[in-house]
Each structure stands twice: as structure tokens, then as C-alpha cells.
């Protein structure tokens, strides 16, 4: 199942790299925990995740996420991401590397967490560098 989970995430990230953030919701469990990087708050449930993403994306004139690497350990997948965006109010272009940990259970995502530091997600996934 874990390789199938990686392939499903790769398809989602392929769309996210184009700035299309609609794909992905079908992967979430009804009570998914979505722990954002920007403000530390968590969105619980599909509707809350959708609302959070709408609010987040409204801050950008252009935003996309490219996946650079997928590391799987059981039902946990660590993704190295490259975020690109242009701020709506500032017009400033931003780019940064971010790490996400996707936890699957029975083929659906039950938790996603983002970090700036690679060590924390590696530890959460049971890996070391």
C-alpha cells in the first residue's frame, strides 16, 4: 500500500506544481489533522482543511508547491517541497524549502504536518540522516 500512497501523492503534487490545489482532498480522512507551517494552527476535518487552504491561497497572486523527494516508511511519507509564490499585497516573490510528513491509515491521509527543519519530520517518520 505504501508505494500506492506515494504514487497518489505524486499525482497531487503534480497538480500543486501547476498551482492547482483542488486535487488532494479525496485523500483525506474525514477527521484529517492538517498542521500548517505558517501559523502553527491545525485544521481538523476536510471542510476545515479546505477553508484553511482557501484563506492561505488568498494571500498570494501566484503560489505553487513542487515535490523534490519522497521518502516512505510504512504508512508515513516525508516529502521535501519547494514553495514558490508572489505575495498579493507586497508583490514580493518568495521561495523556500519545506518538509511535510503525510501519515496514511487504510489508504487515506489522517495527518499532514509541515516543518522548515528537516530533522523534526525525519524523526517523526522514524528516520535519521
Locations of the language-model features?
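A short, polar/proline- and glycine-enriched secondary-structure boundary/capping micro-motif
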Residues: 89-92, 120-127
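A short hydrophobic beta-strand element
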Residues: 74-83
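Exposed beta-sheet edge and beta->alpha loop/turn motif
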Residues: 82-105
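A solvent-exposed, acidic/Ser-Thr-rich amphipathic alpha-helical stretch
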Residues: 4-7, 14, 21-75
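Short beta-strand edge/turn micro-motifs at domain boundaries
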Residues: 99-123
Amino acid at each position: 500500500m505504501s508505494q500506492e500512497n506515494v504514487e497518489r501523492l505524486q499525482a497531487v503534487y503534480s497538480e500543486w506544481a501547476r498551482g492547482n490545489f483542488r486535487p488532494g482532498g479525496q485523500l483525506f480522512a474525514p477527521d484529517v489533522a492538517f498542521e500548517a507551517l505558517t501559523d502553527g494552527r491545525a485544521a481538523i476535518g476536510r471542510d476545515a482543511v479546505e477553508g484553511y487552504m482557501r484563506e492561505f491561497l488568498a494571500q498570494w497572486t501566484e503560489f505553487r508547491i513542487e515535490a523534490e523527494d519522497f521518502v516512505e516508511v510504512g504508512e508515513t511519507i516525508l516529502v521535501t517541497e519547494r514553495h514558490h509564490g508572489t505575495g498579493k499585497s507586497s508583490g514580493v516573490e518568495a521561495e523556500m524549502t519545506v518538509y511535510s510528513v503525510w501519515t496514511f491509515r487504510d489508504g487515506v491521509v489522517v495527518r499532514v504536518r509541515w516543518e522548515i527543519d528537516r530533522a523534526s519530520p525525519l524523526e517523526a517518520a522514524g528516520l535519521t540522516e
